[in-house]
């Protein structure tokens, strides 16, 4: 049965299965649980879960997808959300990322606030992809968006709505490049 009323996604990891659920938060409460990541054995016995509250989210998984990847004992949950209303009263949509320690199921890092492309923020992000390299040292994320051609220091960050972000698995964004 569903843990929360909105299904986000499924991931079959090396040793465990993961399901992600969510619920709407139209009251914009920072204390309301909006995402729950649930860890199961391969025979579907529940092991543990990670509850994520508020995170600037009114509607989790809105107008996009959810994908997961594991590397170095961490589970990366990459998805999207409709955010709290801005100063003009508009609820914009963007990507969001959660990093969870697989053994404790505790949240170790997150990205959900309005930011910029150098931090990996993409709005609007309609399709999210995430993959670790073979060493597990780098995490790559790709978003399908409606973005135009943006440049920073003469380098393209997003072209024709495709944005590629490279992260060190143990840190923040190290570089942004685009491949079409």
Where are these predicted regions, by residue range?
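Blade-loop segments of beta-propeller domains
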Residues: 1-24, 51-57
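Long, internal scaffold/assembly segments composed of regular secondary structure
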Residues: 125-171, 176-178
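Repeated scaffold domains used in trafficking and secretory/extracellular systems
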Residues: 3-13, 58-68, 116-134, 180
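Entry beta-strands of beta-propeller and related beta-repeat scaffolds
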Residues: 15-20, 73-78, 135-140
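Short glycine/acidic-enriched loop and turn motifs that connect beta-strands
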Residues: 24-29, 82-88, 145-150
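Eukaryote-skewed repeat-based solenoidal scaffolds used as protein-protein interaction platforms
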Residues: 60-70, 75-77, 82, 87-95, ...
